[in-house]
Every structure is written in C-alpha cells, then in structure tokens.
Amino acid sequence: MKLAVYGKGGIGKSTTSCNISVALAKRGKKVLQIGCDPKHDSTFTLTGHLIPTIIDTLQEKDFHYEDIWPEDVIYKGYAGVDCVEAGGPPAGAGCGGYVVGETVKLLKELNAFDEYDIILFDVLGDVVCGGFASPLNYADYCLIVTDNGFDALFAANRIAASVREKARTHQLRLAGLIGNRTTKSDLIEKYTENVPIPILQLLPLIEDIRISRVKGKTLFEMSESNPELSPICDYYLNIADQILAKPEGIIPNEVLDRDLFTLLSDFYLNMDSSESSNLTLV
C-alpha cells in the first residue's frame, strides 16, 4: 500500500507522517517513508539526524544509477521504519519536483517498492505542480493534514482538486483529513459539510508534539521514557488502523476557489456577529 501525505507548508506533515509510519510499524508492517522536500527533514524524528539525500548520493556517484545500491540511499529509523530523502537542487536553481520523480525512478530500479508493506510519501507543502504531484501517480490513498484555519483548508481544497484529477487515470482515493493542532474544529466541519471528506483524526494542540520535532524523536520513542504520552500515540495508531482497514476512500469534488473564500469568510463573519450579539445581551 502506498500513501501520499500532503498539506499546507508548516502544518506538521512531517511530524504527523513519522508518527503514522511508526504506528504502522507497530502494527507489524514493513514501512518505508520517503521525504519529498528539498529541506530533506521529513525523516528527522525517525533517524534523529538529517540523512544524506538521493541527490547527494547521485552526485557522489557522478549520476551513475547503476552504481547505487539500496543501502546507499535507505537508512534505518526508529521502530524499523526505513527512510529515504529525495533532497533537491540548490536554492534558486533547478526543479524540486523533478528530483521527486527521479527518486521514485531510482527506487523502482532498485526494486525497493516491492520490499515494503507500506510506502509513505511525505510531500512538500501545498505545491501540486506536476513534479510534486507525482507521488499521487503511485499512491493508493492521499491523506491531507490541515488545521482549523482558512489558509490550511484552502490548501486542502487545492490538494483535493489534484486528487480528483489524478483519479481519472490512477487507482487513487482520498482517505481523509487529519486535523492537526486543532483546539477547535468548527471550520473543518464547515468545509467537510460542503466537500464531503472523511475526518480520520483530530489531533489537539499538544506541546509535546511540537517538542518531539525539536528533540528529533517520534511521540512513540518519547513515550518509552514518559508513559504519560501513550494516549497521544493512540491518535496515530487510530489513523494507522483506519488505513490498514483499506477504507473505500473518495474522489473529492472540491469547491471553486472563489466559493471557498465566500464560504469560509461568511462563516467567520457570522461567528463574529454572533459573538458581538452575545456580548451586547450580556
């Protein structure tokens, strides 16, 4: 099974992806996580450091693909999760999306795709150009990480449009939304009323999740020394269980950009008016 995780930049995709990968490994699956971001920090909390990228290795080998072996690009992470980082071109030069495509090409040539129960692509931000959308060509399911804010849901809507487009020619479905850092979920719920998308999990705003990123550890690893964190791990295990159950998934029908602006803006305005009325009554 292949998963592609998308969402607005800075929304917590990599932290979420790493914890989902570990949760799947805890369920007995052999997992490969592929970081598809030029920052090459997707797998940081799995390995505890920035691993060499595909691009680094290709440069060392003068781009002789035949000289590269799986152990040159695949690194072992926490809970046995294997890790790959695509990397990217120098800042301001080249195409990061092209690198993602080359990463997939190399891993297929190494027969790495056949070695795993689960392959998880953690993809750069909300960019859905051809290169960064390429993981959708291979994925069975797309998962979108969002929060309860306007910008994240706008990005989610654009990603949903990409899923719909790719589903025309590929066996791809949208598994659902993962709400991250959600002290409230009213805007997410308003959006899913208009664009029916399953909500896989709502993760509350928890400081330990942020700290885990700084420490370079998953919540599962941190919970080994702090059992009080185990309930947080259950959120990710729940997501893993839903994915392993092979949900039907959906082909989404996104809202037009202008309509989404109106929908979410009106929601905020009506909410503000309601709060003002309550204050006046008091």
Swiss-Prot record:
ATP binds at residues 10-15, 39, 180-181. Coiled coil: none annotated. GO terms for molecular function: 4 iron, 4 sulfur cluster binding; ATP binding; metal ion binding; oxidoreductase activity, acting on iron-sulfur proteins as donors; oxidoreductase activity, acting on the CH-CH group of donors, iron-sulfur protein as acceptor. Its EC number is 1.3.7.7. Pfam families: Fer4_NifH. CDD domains: Bchl-like. One of its GO terms (cellular component) is cyanelle. Pathway: Porphyrin-containing compound metabolism; chlorophyll biosynthesis (light-independent). Its main location: plastid. Mg(2+) binds at residue 14. It catalyses: chlorophyllide a + oxidized 2[4Fe-4S]-[ferredoxin] + 2 ADP + 2 phosphate = protochlorophyllide a + reduced 2[4Fe-4S]-[ferredoxin] + 2 ATP + 2 H2O. InterPro entries: NifH/chlL_CS, NifH/frxC, P-loop_NTPase, Protochlorophyllide_ATP-bd. PROSITE patterns: NIFH_FRXC_1, NIFH_FRXC_2, NIFH_FRXC_3. It is found in: Plastid, Cyanelle. It comes from the Eukaryota. Binds 1 [4Fe-4S] cluster per dimer. It is an enzyme of class 1 (oxidoreductase). Its cofactor is [4Fe-4S] cluster. Belongs to the NifH/BchL/ChlL family. Component of the dark-operative protochlorophyllide reductase (DPOR) that uses Mg-ATP and reduced ferredoxin to reduce ring D of protochlorophyllide (Pchlide) to form chlorophyllide a (Chlide). This reaction is light-independent. The L component serves as a unique electron donor to the NB-component of the complex, and binds Mg-ATP. This is Light-independent protochlorophyllide reductase iron-sulfur ATP-binding protein. The gene is chlL.
